[in-house]
């Protein structure tokens, strides 16, 4: 056999043996976590988690229901399992990413129609894809210094949503967006930015009186309203009765109590230039910090911080500091399917943060702030462009 043929045969054998790792297919096969492995990971996590009701049960007794998220949110990127006794576990589909991405000790996971949750999950996918460029499994953090802080909003039973009665004073939709069903005659959603902010305000039960009015004009690109559409909130005249602004609503409350929360939501939404519609949005963090101080009289310590300005360790230290001072954090990111705002109000001491999504408690639980492998962050552990342009508003106190 001549040298040329021998070389060809050797290359073929190496390829068949899976040693040509430049081929991403072979690399993914080496690190992929299949469905059985993912389910086993979820069961093991449940058994080791004393906080989850099923924790003391045998593997055979733990019943899991796989959640089909569809598209890139499933399969090779992540698996989500609801626990029959309450709670859920999110497992990454690749061993170059953290094994467990999120969990809850109660309720169930549901991202349908909830854009802030879907967007956050999408950011996980983008980070998992980045990790797939690596040739090393996820090693985790050598030393975890995160404090344990029980959910601050849960401690007061605060679980707001975006529909009735929270949106009874938001603008009424006037037009049909081409290609969509009609929402004409319905009140716009409060928006995740306003809902997150209002939940933090309810936690502090502040202010008793508004400080400064606010007005703005809806963007002419908004397809749900006739233009120009000017919105005004007489915040300076408001007397916020926190006894009537309840921690949560079931629909059986008095009209006074319903109007109290809807007035707060409308004031907050207008103060952050809400882009109203069936799914309302806002630029978020920069406007939230301004509104809290200028319109609602919060402490001048309120300010925005950006993920890209910190290492991973320093960023999480900023969040930990707020939680240790019993101050819920307004948190925001931007992903492929839009922005997402929510409240971080707790920590479990294992690098998971408690998230209140603002959907009446649905899908609330403990989540990692990112799914990145430290090896993907490089020197200094900065954001690396894969943290969804995350920002937070901290120092929120009366």
Swiss-Prot record:
Catalysed reaction equations from the record: Preferential cleavage with hydrophobic residues at P2, P1 and P1'
Effect seen on changing residue 192 to S: Abolished cysteine protease activity and ability to undergo autocatalytic cleavage. Abolished ability to cleave host GSDMA
Disulfide bonds listed in the record: none
Up-regulation conditions: Expression is regulated by the CovR-CovS two-component regulatory system.
Residues under site feature: Cleavage: 53-54, 57-58, 68-69, 79-81, 84-85, 118-119, 129-130, 132-133, 139-140, 145-146, 150-151
Effect seen on changing residue 356 to D: Strongly reduced cysteine protease activity and abolished ability to undergo autocatalytic cleavage
UniProt propeptide residues: 28-145
Outcome when changing residue 357 to A: Strongly reduced cysteine protease activity and ability to undergo autocatalytic cleavage
Ways its activity is controlled: Synthesized as an inactive zymogen to protect the intracellular components of the bacteria from proteolytic activity during protein production. Once secreted into the extracellular milieu, cleaved into the active protease: maturation can be mediated in cis by autocatalytic cleavage, or in trans by mature SpeB or host proteases. Protease activity is strongly inhibited by zinc and copper, which prevent its maturation into an active protease: inhibition by metal ions may be required to prevent proteolysis of streptococcal proteins.
Domain of life: Bacteria
Positions annotated to bind a protein: 282, 339
Cellular component, GO annotation: cytosol; extracellular region; host cell cytosol; host extracellular space
Region C-terminal active site loop, annotated ranges: 368-390
Record PTM: The mature protease is derived from the precursor sequence by cleavage, either in cis via an autocatalytic mechanism, or in trans by mature SpeB or host proteases (trypsin, plasmin or subtilisin). Maturation can involve a number of protein cleavage intermediates. Mature SpeB probably plays the most important role in protein maturation in physiological conditions. Methylthiolation at Cys-192 of the inactive zymogen form is probably involved in the mechanism of secretion of the proteinase into the culture fluid.
Mutagenesis or variant effect for residue 308 to S: In strain: 789
Impact reported for residue 8 to I: In strain: 789
Compartments where found: Secreted; Host extracellular space; Host cytoplasm
MF GO annotations: cysteine-type endopeptidase activity; toxin activity
Reported impact of residue 334 to A: Reduces activity 130-fold
InterPro entries: Papain-like_cys_pep_sf, Peptidase_C10, Spi_Prtas-inh, Streptopain_sf
Signal peptide as annotated in the record: 1-27
Main location, first listed in the record: secreted
Residue positions where Cysteine methyl disulfide is found in the record: 192
Description of its domains: The C-terminal active site loop is required for the recognition and recruitment of substrates and release of hydrolyzed products.
Family: Belongs to the peptidase C10 family.
Protein name, UniProt field: Streptopain
Organism: Streptococcus pyogenes serotype M1
Gene: speB
């Amino acid at each position: 056999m001549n040298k040329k043929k021998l070389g060809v045969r050797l290359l073929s054998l190496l390829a068949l043996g899976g040693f040509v790792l430049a081929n991403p297919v072979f690399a993914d096969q080496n690190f992929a976590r299949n469905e059985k492995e993912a389910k086993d990971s979820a069961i093991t996590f449940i058994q080791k988690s004393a906080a989850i009701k099923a924790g003391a049960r045998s593997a055979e007794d733990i019943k899991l229901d796989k959640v089909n998220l569809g598209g890139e949110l499933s399969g090779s990127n992540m698996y989500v399992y609801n626990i029959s006794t309450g709670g859920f576990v999110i497992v990454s589909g690749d061993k170059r990413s953290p094994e467990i991405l999120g969990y809850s000790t109660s309720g169930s996971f549901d991202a349908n129609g909830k854009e802030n949750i879907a967007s956050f999950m999408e950011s996980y996918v983008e980070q998992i894809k980045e990790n797939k460029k690596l040739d090393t499994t996820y090693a985790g953090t050598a030393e975890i210094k995160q404090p344990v802080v029980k959910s601050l909003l849960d401690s007061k039973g605060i679980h707001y949503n975006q529909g009735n009665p929270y949106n009874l004073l938001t603008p009424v939709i006037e037009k049909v967006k081409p290609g969509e069903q009609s929402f004409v005659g319905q009140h716009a959603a409060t928006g995740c930015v306003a809902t997150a902010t209002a939940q933090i305000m309810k936690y502090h039960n502040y202010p008793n009186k508004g400080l400064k009015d606010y007005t703005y004009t809806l963007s002419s690109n908004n397809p749900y309203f006739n233009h120009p559409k000017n919105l005004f909130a007489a915040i300076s005249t408001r007397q916020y009765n926190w006894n009537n602004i309840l921690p949560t609503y079931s629909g059986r409350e008095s009209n006074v109590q319903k109007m109290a929360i809807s007035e707060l939501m409308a004031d907050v939404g207008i103060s952050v230039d809400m882009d109203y519609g069936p799914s309302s949005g806002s630029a978020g963090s920069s406007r939230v910090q301004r509104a809290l101080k200028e319109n609602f009289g919060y402490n001048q310590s309120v300010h925005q911080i950006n993920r890209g300005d910190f290492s991973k360790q320093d960023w999480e230290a900023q969040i930990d500091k707020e939680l240790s001072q019993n101050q819920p954090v307004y948190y925001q990111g931007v992903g492929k399917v839009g922005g997402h705002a929510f409240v971080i109000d707790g920590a479990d001491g294992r690098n998971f943060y408690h998230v209140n999504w603002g959907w009446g408690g649905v899908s609330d639980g403990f989540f990692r702030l990112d799914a990145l492998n430290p090896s993907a962050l490089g020197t200094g552990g900065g954001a690396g462009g894969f943290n969804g342009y995350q920002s937070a508003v901290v120092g929120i106190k009366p």
